[in-house]
Amino acid sequence: MHFAIPLEYQSELEATEPVDVGTDEEIISSIEQYRPVTSEKNIWAFWDSGILSMPSWCKRNVIGWARICGADWTIRVLDMKPNSPNHVLKFIDRDMLPEAFLSGTMDGHHTGQHSADFIRGPLLHHYGGVSMDVGCLLIRHIDRICWDLLADPDSPYEIAVPVLYDQTIANHFIAARKNNIFIEKWHQLFLHLWNGRTHQQGISDSPLLGFIKDIRYDDATDFHWDWSVPVPQFLEYIAQVLCWQRLCLIRDTGDGFKSSEYWQRNVLCIDSLNEVWGGEKTLGFDGIGPRMYNLLTTRLDADPDSTAYKDAYKLVWRLLTRSSFQKVTRAKNLTYTPHLGTLWDQNEGKDCIPGSFGELLRYGPVHFRQKRENIEQLEASEPRTLIEKGLLEV
């Protein structure tokens, strides 16, 4: 189906053509193959049992990445399937990964998310590129989100990451040049915290994360997810984010690397509310999962004066014109209200019903190009108090 850009958005969008015109099956088949790393333009993702077993909406996300970014970027969805051409250990040395991950003995909640966390640092450090969660519905070309700036020798930026507030990042999208020392230290700390563990429970009790008791949530008021778990349990879910925070707070990691200074000077901070969670920004956080689910199933030929049509229209065109991507979260067993990813898991094909606003949201990123040259950025926040200890020093 062909969709036109409404007159009111023609100053913000222009028509373009997909850079990969292969069929969905051809794109998936290509991603399944082993491809040696030949550049830093790599998109790294993970699904334990392989790309073919991913939920269909996640496959469509990955196919969208290919249609938007084209052959200049190599997409790899790594896995832990025996004899797989994209097995994690074809790209990462064993000593860079926790034993529980290697032996398959992880027994806590969210093992899939933490498995993706384990491979993120080594891949970015050794090869460079972007680590992206398969729940990311990409809207803007990665070059235009951040990579052109990271590759510019006159730019100070060497890493790009969505930032919520202060030193709190969202780790579902991390872009970095290879051999980056900040990324190396980040993974070193995370690996240290997981040494001897099979689950994340209790990890927030580590003295290395003692700073979390002083975290202020004043600046978190823009983010209103309805968490149903105690704060310590949530913090353990985002343990890798806590490791990033520690690195941002340390003056010197013990070997002369000024990590807090590096954070403030060399990290491009993507405004996550505007660029990543545009749906939540537009509709509000209250019941956002069911609301987005229902709006994206709204038909394009519905009554244009109805509230559902107006809200769906506003949502989709806001995303297409002003977001870099929409992170579709699951937050399984973490919130009172199911998130959009969980609902799409449970309802096959509802993300792209023909003739719906969901289909338009799939079509737009591939066939429309944002005219804006720059994304919304935040300034890297200077820590209120620095940690005067080394990376692993208690």
From Swiss-Prot:
Keywords: Glycosyltransferase, Transferase. Pfam families: Caps_synth. Disruption phenotype: Results in enhanced production of cytokinins, including a compound which could be 8-oxo-trans-zeatin, an obvious intermediate for the parallel biosynthesis of 8-oxo-fusatin. It comes from the Eukaryota. Induction: Expressed during infection of barley and Brachypodium. The keyword NADP does not apply. Pathway: Secondary metabolite biosynthesis. Its EC number is 2.4.1.-. One of its GO terms (molecular function) is glycosyltransferase activity. Belongs to the afumC glycosyltransferase family. Probable glycosyl transferase; part of the gene cluster that mediates the biosynthesis of cytokinins such as fusatin, fusatinic acids or 8-oxofusatin, known for their growth promoting and anti-senescence activities toward host plants. FCK1 is a bifunctional enzyme that performs the first steps in the biosynthesis of Fusarium cytokinins. It first condenses adenosine monophosphate (AMP) with dimethylallyl diphosphate (DMAPP) to yield isoprenyl adenosine monophosphate. It then catalyzes the removal of the phosphoribose to produce isopentenylaldehyde. This is Probable glycosyltransferase FCK3. It comes from Fusarium pseudograminearum (strain CS3096). The lineage of its organism: Eukaryota, Fungi, Dikarya, Ascomycota, Pezizomycotina. The gene is FCK3.
